[in-house]
């Protein structure tokens, strides 16, 4: 039976946001995570740590080798917010930084260059 990764190699996230957290402890570099709603699966998602981000396409590769694509505008989905709170609790995360505006700005900049 094919794995979930083979069946759904790219997870498209709507109503997305991006956060940094000290996942590996206070002294380690903070990791970036996408939070959003995967409409195709009908599920809220928190990505594993993002390793590479392509702002031109709004696509990122995660530590789990899954590909995430940020679709449409940034925002907050109620189920995603609950999933994010639960994820932080499970990973004992007390601090986080919302870096959504920076990601949105970079993506918007690339989109406007494509239109021009």
Predicted features along the sequence, with ranges:
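Cysteine-centric segments in proteins
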Residues: 1-59, 66-116
